[in-house]
Structures are given as structure tokens and as C-alpha cells.
Amino acid sequence: MPTGDFDSKPSWADQVEEEGEDDKCVTSELLKGIPLPTGDTSPEPELLPGDPLPPPKEVINGNIKTVTEYKVEEDGKKFKIVRTFRIETRKASKAVARRKNWKKFGNSEFDPPGPNVATTTVSDDVSMTFITSKEDLNCQEEEDPMNKLKGQKIVSCRICKGDHWTTRCPYKDTLGPMQKELAEQLGLSTGEKEKLPGELEPVQAAQNKTGKYVPPSLRDGASRRGESMQPNRRADDNATIRVTNLSEDTRETDLQELFRPFGSISRIYLAKDKTTGQSKGFAFISFHRREDAARAIAGVSGFGYDHLILNVEWAKPSTN
């Protein structure tokens, strides 16, 4: 590889290191050939050890300002700092211009005009938008009718009066038996169905859980006639109500809990889909007494249940 000898002038940094033993960092001889940013080639004063540092010098040439400062390091070496600024003229409001003329105080009492990098951080401008009261009123959201329903209870628990189903009450194992026992003592038990004057008590099968075969003639209900042969079948049709607008998750137990407080229920029919098993949205509830059915219509019709408004009316009599 060809090589050649180049007669290059040593750099200023190399000469400073070579003269470090003499504690001469910057001399007039080294500064003669270095042009200043302002175009001034006048020699700089010699920085000799023990001599005081020259005062800072500021030169303005058009829109360029050059600031020259001298400092001493910990090891005693002296060096020069040259900073160049571009002067820009910007229009500001009277309030901003007035604040810039305020007298500085504290550690910045003797600082020159303008920000000091030691105590001031210059960042991007933040624009602020002030909204008047009229604009604030226009930005208000319109009142949503559904917000009024948020504070209302759609479902009420019979045990703790909370906004959840009675079957999902966390206190049903503790408060439920206590309320039932208290109701039995007062004669207001809701667990026992009301008996009609002509209704027979069902015959309980004695020891029917032993695994032995029990003939149909000895099973529970063998001494009673079939449901279709009862004389009060037609009376049930007169005390039957029709409930519509039910949710798909409604079950017979939910209807039993909803309508039991109004009276004794003889039967419940909930229309379900054959494939999915979900409710079709309507059901029929038959009471033993027509007065109980009338009270159920007055109490449940228009009631909010599972986020839906129920519609209860008299069922049309069967044509069969």
C-alpha cells in the first residue's frame, strides 16, 4: 500500500497536551491562526498560571452573538469556552414583555437578561384553550332516559332485599332459615301451600327410599283421581293469568318465587323452545282462587323483572 509523508500542522489539542507541563493551555501564538466566529482574528490574552482569569467577553455581529468565557479545571488547567447564539426577534404580548423586565432575585439576582441554563429549562410552548361558560353549557350531555332506570331496582331479593335473585342470595343459607322459622311462628309461612277445603292431603310413601319396588296402587297419589277428572279443572281456567315479555333465562322456579306471595298456585306453564330449551317469552299461571289471580295482575303488571317490563292479563278460557 503506498504511503507518503504529509507535512501537517499539529492540532491545537496536541499542542495543549505537549505544553501541559508548563501549565500553558492557551497562548497567543496558538490563537493567531484560529478565526473567531465573529470574524475577529485579534489575539487572545495569554492564560498564565497564577494570573486572574479574563472577564467574559460578548461580541454581537448582526444577528450573531458570541460569548467567550474562561474557566479553571480542578487540576489547575485553564480553558476557554466560546458560545455562539443566533438572535431572533419575536413579537410577544405586553404581559410577556413586562415579565421579562422583572428584576431577578435569589441565586439569579445578578444574572444577565434572558434564561440561565443553570436555573431555567426551556421547553416547547404549551397552548391553552379557555372555554367560556356558554360553550360549557353546550357541551353538556343530553339527559339519557336510561340513566333514570339505573337507580331503580329491577330485581329485589326476598331475603336481604338486594338487587339480585333470591336463589343467588349469599345469605340464603343463614337468613333464609331464620326468616322461615319466624314466619312459621307468626303463621305466615310461604313455604307451605294453602289447602282448599275439599283438597286431600297427599299420602306420603313410608320408607320409599329403601330401593324396594312399590306398585302403582301403593305409590303417592294412588288414592286420588287424575288431574283431568278433578271438578275444579274448570275453576282453574277462570283463575289463570297470562304473563308476557319474559326473558329467555326465566325458569319455572323464578315464576314460582314471583307469584307465590299473591296466593296458592295450582300449576305453572312456561312456553319453551324445543331445541334450545329457552323461554319463548310468555307463561300461564293458575291460582286456586280468582281473587289471588286478580291481586297478581294488579301487583306484577308493569313490574320491572330481569331488565324487562312484564305484562300480566287474564288468560282466555280454553275452548276444549
Swiss-Prot record:
Keyword Nucleus: yes
Top-level division of the source organism's lineage: Eukaryota
Pfam family, one: RRM_1
GO molecular function, one term: translation initiation factor activity
Free-text description of this protein's post-translational modifications in UniProt: Phosphorylated. Phosphorylation is enhanced upon serum stimulation.
Keyword Protein biosynthesis: yes
Primary location group: cytoplasm
Region named Disordered: 1-60, 205-233
Residues recorded as bearing Phosphothreonine in the entry: 38, 41
Span of domain RRM: 239-317
GO CC field: cytoplasm; eukaryotic 43S preinitiation complex; eukaryotic 48S preinitiation complex; eukaryotic translation initiation factor 3 complex; perinuclear region of cytoplasm
Biological process terms in GO annotation: formation of cytoplasmic translation initiation complex; translational initiation; viral translational termination-reinitiation
Keywords recorded for this protein, A-Z: Cytoplasm, Initiation factor, Nucleus, Phosphoprotein, Protein biosynthesis, RNA-binding
Biased composition (Basic and acidic residues): 221-233
General function of this protein: RNA-binding component of the eukaryotic translation initiation factor 3 (eIF-3) complex, which is required for several steps in the initiation of protein synthesis. The eIF-3 complex associates with the 40S ribosome and facilitates the recruitment of eIF-1, eIF-1A, eIF-2:GTP:methionyl-tRNAi and eIF-5 to form the 43S pre-initiation complex (43S PIC). The eIF-3 complex stimulates mRNA recruitment to the 43S PIC and scanning of the mRNA for AUG recognition.
Family of the protein in this entry: Belongs to the eIF-3 subunit G family.
Quaternary structure (record): Component of the eukaryotic translation initiation factor 3 (eIF-3) complex, which is composed of 13 subunits: EIF3A, EIF3B, EIF3C, EIF3D, EIF3E, EIF3F, EIF3G, EIF3H, EIF3I, EIF3J, EIF3K, EIF3L and EIF3M. The eIF-3 complex appears to include 3 stable modules: module A is composed of EIF3A, EIF3B, EIF3G and EIF3I; module B is composed of EIF3F, EIF3H, and EIF3M; and module C is composed of EIF3C, EIF3D, EIF3E, EIF3K and EIF3L. EIF3C of module C binds EIF3B of module A and EIF3H of module B, thereby linking the three modules. EIF3J is a labile subunit that binds to the eIF-3 complex via EIF3B.
Name recorded for this polypeptide: Eukaryotic translation initiation factor 3 subunit G
Organism the protein comes from: Rattus norvegicus (Rat)
